[in-house]
Amino acid sequence: MTDIENKNYIIALDQGTTSSRAIIFDRDANVVCTAQREFAQHYPQAGWVEHDPMEIFATQSAVMVEALAQAGLHHDQVAAIGITNQRETTVVWDKTTGRPVYNAIVWQCRRSTEICQQLKRDGHEDYIRDTTGLVTDPYFSGTKLKWILDNVEGSRERARNGELLFGTVDSWLIWKFTGGKVHVTDYTNASRTMLFNIHTLEWDAKMLEILDIPREMLPEVKASSEIYGRTKSGIAIGGIAGDQQAALFGQMCVEPGQAKNTYGTGCFLLMNTGDKAVKSQHGMLTTIACGPRGEVAYALEGAVFNGGSTVQWLRDELKIVNDAHDTEYFANKVKDSNGVYLVPAFTGLGAPYWDPYARGALFGLTRGVRVDHIIRAALESIAYQTRDVLDAMQQDSGERLKALRVDGGAVANNFLMQFQADILGTQVERPKMRETTALGAAYLAGLACGFWGSLEELRGKAVIEREFEPSLDEVEKEKLYKGWKKAVSRTRDWAREDAE
């Protein structure tokens, strides 16, 4: 037997916005066990979001140890590790000490809005779009990195001297797990930085010049499925993909026109466009995805900033539900939202609006409105935002989706999934395997080390648990959606005067 035949497990490390997880898969792509730890969110100012990079690594290390112990496994039985991560979140650390120079600036953080406005005033918007596939928005890593270099004393000079390293969360974790030996990222994560040319597949010299970022601090960029290095205990690290691209691969959306939506803290809809980098006319991002063998493919992406976080707000701030699972019960207690629309623009609006100055609002309140209606409106807002993105994506690609594959925590909510199908007028497919993001990372690692032999083998493992068919008539569907568009229009530009 070969060495790989003696190793019957893959570990996927899923480093998310609110927690670090480790999921162990067997050869049939079944989950053997899962370990999870939450970590602190830091909000130093309105619109600012930070994480402690050391806590990210500590929790991610701990859950890997926990998962192995829980499964009764030794690291010698693991063929490889696949890593999937919250994207865009920006870490800068000292190459010698391994200590971060500042907290990780999270993808949700809007502190670099003014930097983005200056880029637009300087006429760089079209170049950024054409080269990186991205819109000029604080969401992406480049302006976050510039903020750190501008605001942490001595950091730019230290970066120029080769003393500091930059990475998205995948780079940070791999650097730590390999004891500082490997400084890499993959094409999917690099494509989210606003520093990477998605056509030449290289760091873009002009973007680095525009943002005054030293080339020396950037990681080497590699394919999403190859062996990058080994942990201190000798486990191969064999797959990397940003969380949404990992989910696309885990759903086996590897052919042009296939699409998925992940319902997490935010919502992310990706459509595979194959070897064609489609330039969006409707506010979508052009991004890099994983091809059939982990090579570069392209995708259109629409990012909704507040999905599951809207339900967290109901629970943690308004305290009108005790648990996210309760929202389905309350939403089903009423026949509709009674004309209420909740626009959860807590941190601005993502695709297709890209308005950092929009703010959240409730519309249509009357004395007849109850808590149930507001809870229902919150769930409906997730589906409406998904339609905003999907409509734009279909116009760009010229393709009509026959079905939308879904994953993420909120897909367990049957009310939301049915309303999603209704407001889209499109079948929604919920897979039996809910861990599609982690599964995508596991697939990439497994293909890299020979644990799985082919894409065909992986396709055979996909099972649809339930299909949700549209049940709303066309007139009612469009009436509801028209109300949503009206509500969104009233939230636009709300905070602009405060910022000026």
Swiss-Prot record:
One of its GO terms (molecular function) is ATP binding. Glycerol binds at R87, E88, Y139, D243, Q244. CDD domains: FGGY_EcGK_like. The keyword Kinase applies. ATP binds at T17, T18, S19, T265, G308, Q312, G409. Pfam families: FGGY_C, FGGY_N. It comes from the Bacteria. Its EC number is 2.7.1.30. ADP binds at T17, R21, T265, G308, G409, N413. It catalyses: glycerol + ATP = sn-glycerol 3-phosphate + ADP + H(+). GO terms for biological process: glycerol catabolic process; glycerol metabolic process; glycerol-3-phosphate metabolic process. Sn-glycerol 3-phosphate binds at T17, R87, E88, Y139, D243. The keyword ATP-binding applies. It is an enzyme of class 2 (transferase). InterPro entries: ATPase_NBD, Carb_kinase_FGGY, Carb_kinase_FGGY_CS, FGGY_C, FGGY_N, Glycerol_kin. GO terms for cellular component: cytosol. Key enzyme in the regulation of glycerol uptake and metabolism. Catalyzes the phosphorylation of glycerol to yield sn-glycerol 3-phosphate. This is Glycerol kinase. The lineage of its organism: Bacteria, Pseudomonadati, Pseudomonadota, Gammaproteobacteria, Pseudomonadales.
